[in-house]
Amino acid sequence: MNAFSKFSQKQFRVFFSYKNNPVKLFSLFLFIQFFAVCNSEQNSEKKEILFRLISEFQIDLQKNLESAIRTKGIVGAIDVCRTISPQKEADLKKEFPGVLIKRISEKPRNPNHRPEVWETEIFNQWKESQKTGMAPYTVVLSKDREVRILQPIVLQSPTCLQCHGGPQDINPAVSKKIAELYPNDQAKGYKLGELRGAFSATW
């Protein structure tokens, strides 16, 4: 017997035991309604916070990368990208216990950034939508007390191609540095406008 069946039977037994007591039955319905409203309000608040954190993550990463490119060049910026993203993920997890925000991709540079099953399903939805001309869209999933958000990352700047484009876009020195840091790198061969990955948030 699965967990849902057990839960349903338990609900039925509670309802049956209360059916001859209108006061208890009314109280039960009020409790269920209150619980549902509380969950909905809590998830709504979580969603707002997650969107804000994703935005801050994206802005901080872009700001630091642009600064590193100006001062250290593309090769030096690779090290910055390699360290700042995991550090930002760890800082958010520490500041907001239970929150997990990370960048993921089906063609990751960091092997720890591969998508989970539910994320892969959404990637597949995005790819099917793109065939009809629809751009990837942000997906929000809410169930019980958990909220999940997947926000697409699309390559929009020619600068991104200097690390993620084809052989004609990537300087040999950059290719060498990437190979040293990421021997199993898959995050190349992209074109402008293509789906690079996503910001994934769970709370």
Model-identified regions with their sequence ranges:
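Hydrophobic helical h-region of N-terminal Sec-dependent signal peptides
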Residues: 28-32
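Bacterial N-terminal signal peptides that target proteins for export
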Residues: 4-26
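C-terminal motif of bacterial Sec signal peptides marking the signal peptidase cleavage site
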Residues: 36-37
